[in-house]
From Swiss-Prot:
GO CC annotation: nucleus
Chain ranges of the TCP domain: 50-108
Keywords: Developmental protein, DNA-binding, Nucleus, Transcription, Transcription regulation
Protein name: Transcription factor TCP24
Entry's localization field: Nucleus
Tissue: Expressed in cotyledons, particularly in the vascular region, in leaves, roots, stems, buds, flowers and siliques.
Subunit relationships: Forms a heterodimeric complex with ABAP1. Interacts with SPL.
Biased composition (Low complexity): 127-142, 261-281
One record GO biological process: regulation of DNA-templated transcription
Amino acid sequence: MEVDEDIELQKHQEQQSRKLQRFSEDNTGLMRNWNNPSSRIIRVSRASGGKDRHSKVLTSKGLRDRRIRLSVATAIQFYDLQDRLGFDQPSKAVEWLINAASDSITDLPLLNTNFDHLDQNQNQTKSACSSGTSESSLLSLSRTEIRGKARERARERTAKDRDKDLQNAHSSFTQLLTGGFDQQPSNRNWTGGSDCFNPVQLQIPNSSSQEPMNHPFSFVPDYNFGISSSSSAINGGYSSRGTLQSNSQSLFLNNNNNITQRSSISSSSSSSSPMDSQSISFFMATPPPLDHHNHQLPETFDGRLYLYYGEGNRSSDDKAKERR
């Protein structure tokens, strides 16, 4: 847009300089042009002449605007005269007034037709136009170069941003696809309420190879109801099925047998262990002999109860006695 305005300004300045050049030939030419009203019309653009886009006329006092501002009273009288004459255009009413006052106009003194000051103004205008044209051309060229460089930088920046976005999207998609395979299994701390149902792994390092070994120990899910060993006598036997039974021999013995076997395997594979003897004895200890007829917990047992359905620890002799 600015380049177009500069070009338009140059065109108008050239037209103005060409029209002003008509009056600088000689005095006779100036008088001839002075008598020709059409040759005294000069068009001025808004860029060079300010607010006006219309043409101006050349007078003895320089360029003047064709539009005339009238006072309120004069404008009322003029438009009343125009309406009485029946003219559509104000210029026709002005022409009628000039013709009607021709006798009075001839009595007026003649105008000074010496246009030396106009030649000086013309030369100044030409120099100003030439300098302004050169400056505007240089400015337009520099602006064009700056805009071209700015467009190139913008294109390069846009291309770099696009490539970066594509690369980030590709890398994120690749990480999404391969993220599950790169993750290593982490050691979990079994502290929840449901951890008792899962096997627990204990790492026992070997003194010779310094490699950790995972030895799973399965623990029976215990529920501590805070019942002492003497409360088992209140139950009065095993008359009902699906009740809480204390000191279940079958499952507890099987579980301890499994623990003993696994502990013996681990102890045979490693001669020394950093664990203390008390923790080892907890896993490898065997329960004391149980009495099926005396339904009381031993002193070494901590009073924990286990829930079983059926009659897992009852012998066939007890069942036969109850049936009789």
